[in-house]
Structure formats: structure tokens, C-alpha cells
Amino acid sequence: MTIIDGFNRFESKAPPRWLDTITHVFFPERCLFCREVLSSSEGRPICRSCSNGFSPVGLICPACENIIIGKSSCLCQSSFSYLQSLFALSYYVGQWRFLLHNLKYYKRRSLARPLGRWLGLEIITRQFCQPDVIVSIPLHIFREKERGFNQSSLIASYTARTIGKRHLPLLNKTIDTISQTTLSRRERFENIRNVFSSNKILPQGTEVMLIDDIYSTGSTMKEAAKVLSSSGAKVHGAVIAYNPLIK
């Protein structure tokens, strides 16, 4: 039995399926963008009208952070040893920025379900990777108590449920850092250095999908991936939104 098989304390914050079902009966799911009631046949949490023309950002090169077209490798032919691949659902603009801002700062936890499920559906459709386990970027315990929840953990819980994998707490954030929001690219990497830890040793080659809400410079995800890699994992990243403006 591996450590993953024997891990009893799941991090998943998603409510039980029966509660989701009852909630959907009395409060039908609505389009994330226009709020139209969705039919039960809808896959993505947006209506057909809003989904016209939408295409996920897709694969991003972890080394040069350019978009990878098709399934070929990036033209830069570089590699980032800790992060094997990276998938983004959208760009951090417009309505996507509004949704994530409301989830994170205005505590609209209900947004985590459709966002996490949508990410999971796209991962399945595009056969992004076949992870053994889902892990989310952790908050420091003081920051999570202050906010009341971890938005990345909530999103990851629903993504894990959608793709049928477990969401496990394999990472801890041991230092309560200042916000990355106003920092430059260089400052972000310095701010997040050596702030994550893990006391779990994984079977060599365990495929881990590391989930966060936003990828900007990649400083947070790459630092977390470094820790998971040192524990024996092969790490793939997946995010709701990609913000390529900070270089």
C-alpha cells in the first residue's frame, strides 16, 4: 500500500454529491456569464450562446510561458525540471477576472463549483494528463483562518471530483508571506522562495496535478512544484486563468 492509498485525511472541501443534487433541484445552475438557467444537458457551466467562440488557452510552456499550439512541444525547446506541463482554462481578463475576484475577495464560494468542474471537463476533453492525485496551492494557516477558506482548494476539490481523482493535502505553507499583487516578477520569486514544505514521500513517478486559481509569473506554482518533485512526484499544473502581463 502506498502513502497515497493510506492517506486518510482528505483535503476536499466540496460538499457531498447528494447535497449538490438537492441544491441543483431548488437552485438550478445558471450560466456563469449571463445568468441564464442551464439545461441538464449542458456540460460547461455556461450557456450555448456564451460558449460560442470560447476556446481554452490550453497548454503553456512552463519554461518560456508562451502558448503551445497543438500537442507539439514549445519552440523554445527548453524544459522546467519541476513542472512537466501547464494548462490554463482562460486569460485573466474581463469576466474571468471578475469571477475570480469575487470568489477570492468577496467570498463567493459558490463560484468554485462551476469553475472547478469546468477545469476538470476541459482536462478530460483535451486529455491533458492522467494524474494519480490532485494537490492545491495551500495558504498559510493564519491567512486561511482570516479569509475563511482557500479558493484554490475549493476549485481543486471540484476538479478532482469531476475527473474522479483524490484531492490530498500534500503541501503546507510554512511562512506567511506578503501579498504578491504589487510585487515585480523578481520580487515575487524572492517572496515565495522556500515557503512550502511537505512531509509526504510519494512513490517515485507519482503523477500530481497541482491546481491554483491564477498563474502570473509562475513563482508560486513553480516553488510548490519543486517541493513536490523532491518528494518523488512528476508535477503538472492547471489553473483557471493565465495572466501573462507580468514579465
Labelled PLM ranges:
Residues 1-247:
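Glycine-rich phosphate/pyrophosphate-handling loop used in enzymes and phosphotransfer proteins
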